Amino acid sequence: MTQHNNGAFPEGFLWGAATAAYQVEGAASEDGRKDSIWDTFSRVPGAVVNAENGDVACDHYHRHGEDVALMKSLNLASYRFSTSWARIRPDGGAVNPAGLDFYSRLTDNLLGAGIKPWLTLYHWDLPQALQDAGGWANRDTAYRFAEYALSVHDVLGDRVQAWTTLNEPWCSAYLGYASGEHAPGLQDRSLAVAANHHLLLAHGLAAQELKARDSALEVGLTLNFTVADPADQDNPEDVDAARRIDGQFNRIFADPVFHGAYPADVLADLAPYGLEHHIGEDDLSIISTPIDFLGVNYYHGEAVTKTPPAQALSTAAPAARPTASPYPAADGVYSVPRGLPVTNMGWEIQPEGLHRLLLRLQQDYTGPAGVPLYITENGAAFDDDVVVDGIVQDQDRLEFIEAHLGAVQDAVADGVDVRGYFAWSLMDNFEWAWGYAKRFGIVHVDYQSLVRTPKASARWFAEAARTNALPQRASGEAPDVVSSMQ
């Protein structure tokens, strides 16, 4: 890994960690909260590994004071969390003041600790009542989302500066409506492309409303990205396979937001599923409302081919319920293992992919728009089975984060405007269809006692945040930065 400027990051670089409401909060039936699509989906036989759910999760709802103190001890400058639509507007309609009060207390605790709240309005927990009316396949949900956004701003707008509308709408649309591996568990490609468009419309409507309320707010969007490479660059079919995955994963969201249009090739690919029929007269001008930042979630890239046998593209959890491809127009496209190390999710570890992605985003999207980038999620699941003196020695996760932060440094040195990095995740939590089988946290959670214990990666990350630089260490050694946390 190339290091620039003695491992230092730009002045003001934001160090944080991220979670999501359903994954950490628990308190699923308290203070007026009602079912989200994930509560419902978790009850479907075979949908989630071990039939687990977020009823208790990490109990962040009751332990957020302890958790904020932990964040402060880790030198975090920002905490990226999501508000639960099912807690704030439980039926999709009337506001539940008790639900908003939780986020008000959390925000006050964060500000009291000197930690910037980084709020995400939607991280996949649509109220079940709205799903019963069609969910994201129903255009009306976009307008209900804008109303929900304003109800959150009513209470938190005086204290929260950074507002993210959606987290990873690709997952909401295509894992939720095409593959069926996420809530609401549908497998209908036409519904998936409808959800895609309505999610983007929801983003644009909420961004417009929030900026109309307060033009000084930082309003942005978080997208997950892949880097799709043809397995054989000299094979036109493999080149087309990479184009299809890039189009249906990356460009289908980034192009409307930054260019005000869907890519022509993607529209052609998806023509059988009717994407164009959902685009209203003013929709693309709403969707391309200027934003103040782009959040980038990156975990891995992939080499793709149209030559079987190879691996299926989806790495769905081994739940009993059958799933389908999340790509409406990539039948016959496969993933090709490249011999790279992999995480416990089976995802290849490819930090140079993040470097390439950031260069591309700066060149094609954010640079021309004058919009900064933040890494809003990056991290890895590993076994965490090496424990010394009660501390998880997660050297593999530490090295994963270190390598990807190095890729960020390389991108910054190449002129990319990256202003912060949020580790995924602050703590082990409910990993969607995987249940509690996969641990992404830099803090270990004992799911019986709910005790939190910082892992070696957390201690290393705390030192990086304190010094605004990559800590120097001997190869194979985790740094002893306990003193900096006391």
Segments (PLM) and residue ranges:
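Internal amphipathic alpha-helical repeat/solenoid segments
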Residues: 60-69, 90, 99
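A common structural microfeature
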Residues: 12-14, 61, 78
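Catalytic domains of carbohydrate-active enzymes, especially glycoside hydrolases
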Residues: 63-84, 289, 293, 364
